[in-house]
Amino acid sequence: TIVEYELTWLPEGFSFQKEQDLSNSTYLTYANDSGQRILFSYLEGNDATSLFMAADYTEVQSVQIGNINADFYQASQETSPNGLVWVSEEENMCFCITASLPKDTIIKVAEGIQKNNQKNF
């Protein structure tokens, strides 16, 4: 069974919209009333490139999420979302958050990720 993860902290006004399960990856979409979106995705393994295309990014910064190193991709245009990508070795999972939000906010969202084993079918 695939482990489920969820965001426990969201910026004000954001709420969960939908979940999309693909063969080995999961995409969760959160949005606010003005149409801004946070996309949280994760998959088993360490191939983060399949979650995230780092094409139109001007700058990559190393940041910390707790004790895990992550890459923050600063979008080159205001209209493009920023991205945060990291791999958890112990979970053998990689994670990605993309949102048109400031770096500090996206990191705070990432720090609130919780494993959710209470999956009710």
PLM regions with names:
Residues T1-E90:
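Short, solvent-exposed recognition patches
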Residues E90-F121:
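Surface-exposed amphipathic alpha-helical segments
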